[in-house]
Amino acid sequence: MSGTCVIGLQWGDEAKGKLVDLLAPRFDWVVRYQGGANAGHTVVAGDETYKLHHIPSGILHSDVQNVITPGVVINPTTMLQEIDGLQARGIDVFENLKVSERAHLVMPWHMIEDATINATAVRGESIGTTNRGIGPCYRDKVGRTHAIRMIDLIEGSRDERIATVAGQKQVLLKNLGASEEELDSIAPEKMVALAASWAERLAPMIADTTDMVLDAAEANQKMLFEGAQGALLDIDHGTYPFVTSSNSSGVGVCAGAGVPPKWINQVLGVCKAYSTRVGGGPFPSELEDETGEKIRKLGNEFGTTTGRPRRCGWFDAVAVRYTARLSGVTRLALMMMDVLAHFDELKVCVAYELDGKEIHRVPAHAEQLRRCKPIYETIQGWNTPVDDARSVDDFPPLAMAYVKRIEELVGIPVGVLSVGPDRAQTIFTEESKVMGL
């Protein structure tokens, strides 16, 4: 089997969805393996723009089978809204999307819990939650007692199970300070009716995706694994506690999708030509000045899911080298090169200064990373638009010098360059041929 992963190497929002959409026709399957509706993928196809949260970006290609595997947590209401939006635009989602019976459900009580707990944030600073209930759902998944899975929707004991957990959650959330209105919204009878409505529509899509994926792999079919968020948000390896609740780096692919490591052949690490972050947490190369604001405006850096303005900064080679090594990246995709075409001078963070010492690693403790001062290398900008570039030969020499320097600092060749949101604004370099792209 040929398995290729698309992994974000920063704090998410690296334009992974664009690449998955572009690469999908070359594969038989697109597999979404972690995260939930907290992640947003934007795909631009001609005059159409699609904003996807649950559904794999391969859904825009009718001859590609899309699957959502056990590592994903699903809000059925949100997913059905997403499905209805796509169906209204002529995309037959039910025909080529299957959802794992093992996937856990984000229930209405999870969103109440998310907002309530986030009100008492770390150091008064939000950990970056989208209040979509993702963290509490993963917490229940690990705790097991209150977890609801997709298969529970179609089992005979559904109503009893839902009613029992809803009643228990009312008690727990009351103790956390939830309002009477919030508690009433998750009354057992309301949750039972809601689950029944979900089951009626989703039942045809629920399947044993683990068995499907393994059968396809053994039949030597080509698979594209689509990650959500970015590796710096990984629950185990990211900038903890300002992280997500799943393994968003390359280490999460096999567990989330249910495939053995031997079937992952290539890993495409996606990063912007600069850095962005949403929500709280340390960000060594952040620019809290007019340069950062210029990047935000040029890159339209506002969250797909929340609409929140993203924090912007220079490219952090220390962080990207770390996540690229962690994820086993074989080639880089350097996105948003068009944004940097408006600067006379660029900077790249090549090391940190921590308590007077130069370091070349990402500290495990958030407070240590917060104390890190970026050590920059200045690179001459090209200050020439590259939006119309369709090959490496169309790039100004100074732009290619920037690309080469990123390759040197990260230690991995660049296989893809992006100069805009449209599919046509994507350039595959000679290095991409190694991946069979």
Swiss-Prot record:
> Which UniProt keywords are given for this protein, alphabetically ordered?
Cytoplasm, GTP-binding, Ligase, Magnesium, Metal-binding, Nucleotide-binding, Purine biosynthesis
Cross-referenced Gene3D superfamilies, in alphabetical order?
Answer: Adenylosuccinate Synthetase, subunit A, domain 1, Adenylosuccinate Synthetase, subunit A, domain 2, Adenylosuccinate Synthetase, subunit A, domain 3
Reaction(s) catalysed by this chain, per the record, are: IMP + L-aspartate + GTP = N(6)-(1,2-dicarboxyethyl)-AMP + GDP + phosphate + 2 H(+)
- Where does the chain bind IMP? D13, E14, A15, K16, N38, A39, G40, H41, T130, R144, Q229, T244, R308
Q: What is its main location?
A: cytoplasm
> Which EC number(s) does UniProt give?
6.3.4.4
GO terms in the biological process aspect are: 'de novo' AMP biosynthetic process; IMP metabolic process
Q: Does the keyword Disulfide bond apply?
A: no
The record's active-site residues are D13 (proton acceptor), H41 (proton donor)
Q: Which InterPro entries match?
A: Adenylosuccin_syn_GTP-bd, Adenylosuccin_syn_Lys_AS, Adenylosuccinate_synth_dom1, Adenylosuccinate_synth_dom2, Adenylosuccinate_synth_dom3, Adenylosuccinate_synthetase, P-loop_NTPase
What this protein needs as a cofactor is:
Mg(2+)
Annotated Mg(2+) binding sites? D13, G40
Family, according to the entry, reads as follows: Belongs to the adenylosuccinate synthetase family.
How it assembles, according to the record, is: Homodimer.
What this chain does, per the entry, is described as: Plays an important role in the de novo pathway of purine nucleotide biosynthesis. Catalyzes the first committed step in the biosynthesis of AMP from IMP.
Name of the protein in question = Adenylosuccinate synthetase
What is the species listed in this Swiss-Prot or TrEMBL entry?
Rhodopirellula baltica (strain DSM 10527 / NCIMB 13988 / SH1)
Recorded name of the encoding gene = purA
